A protein has these predicted regions:
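Basic, polyanion-binding surface patches
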Residues: 1-137
Length: 137
């Protein structure tokens, strides 16, 4: 699984097309396949965040004839510079896009990070510095 970058989201969308079995969509779209951790399926080298997902289970949904696939993440790759000390990953800084439905692509805008919500507080504390994190606050 790959996070799609803002500068190549149109090619990322086109990769979802049902190409003939003998057509290499990486070649068709000018994307670069890379292989990691013994996985048969390639990741996209241009993606700033890549995840190796192993299929664990699958259920057929009779109401719409779709399949619900359950996977387990086996490996993750991203630039170390995007990782804060407390584990926050700066996706917006990596230039990835968000997807809604099957065809809606969006850019995001950071608002703030909020403290862990607790019943005894009325509103969570805000941390505007996304990379600073809560352990440094």
């Amino acid at each position: 699984m790959n996070h799609v970058g803002r500068d190549w989201y149109m090619r990322g969308h086109q990769a979802s097309a049902r190409y003939a079995e003998d057509v290499n969509e990486f070649e068709e779209l000018g994307l670069t396949p890379i292989y990691r951790c013994g996985f048969e399926a390639p990741a996209v080298e241009e993606a700033p965040v890549r995840l190796g997902l192993e299929r664990v289970d699958e259920w057929r949904i009779p109401q719409n004839e779709c399949r619900f696939v359950v996977g387990q993440i086996r490996w993750v790759e991203f630039p170390e510079s995007a990782l804060a000390q407390d584990g926050y990953l700066d996706l917006e800084g990596l230039g990835v896009v968000a997807l809604s439905s099957l065809d809606g692509y969006h850019v995001t805008q950071k608002l703030s990070r909020l403290a862990y919500a607790k019943p005894e507080q009325s509103v969570a504390d805000s941390q505007p510095d996304f990379m600073k994190g809560w352990q440094d606050a």
